[in-house]
């Protein structure tokens, strides 16, 4: 479910614009996507966990807001990110 420090560091290195870049929209979206993927696996075996489902919906909404911001500010970075994460088909 939750990401380990090593997993977070790997995501930051892969999607960050610099060495210690944890605040850029790309990194935030990538971290949220990893958390969302983990929760989706959790819900396959725990269908009645509505409390965690609320957290999942909150993460999805936050990711959507960050993607909208990135699309508005720098469309090329947005396209690159969704292609790398495989979010749109």
Curated annotation (Swiss-Prot):
GO annotation, cellular component aspect: cytosolic small ribosomal subunit
GO MF entries: rRNA binding; structural constituent of ribosome
PROSITE patterns per the UniProt record, alphabetical: RIBOSOMAL_S15
Keywords on record: Ribonucleoprotein, Ribosomal protein, RNA-binding, rRNA-binding
Source domain of life: Bacteria
UniProt cross-references to SMART domains, sorted A to Z: Ribosomal_S15
Subunit structure of this chain's protein: Part of the 30S ribosomal subunit. Forms a bridge to the 50S subunit in the 70S ribosome, contacting the 23S rRNA.
Function: One of the primary rRNA binding proteins, it binds directly to 16S rRNA where it helps nucleate assembly of the platform of the 30S subunit by binding and bridging several RNA helices of the 16S rRNA. Forms an intersubunit bridge (bridge B4) with the 23S rRNA of the 50S subunit in the ribosome.
Family statement drawn from the similarity comment of this UniProt entry: Belongs to the universal ribosomal protein uS15 family.
Name of this protein: Small ribosomal subunit protein uS15
Gene name of the encoded protein: rpsO
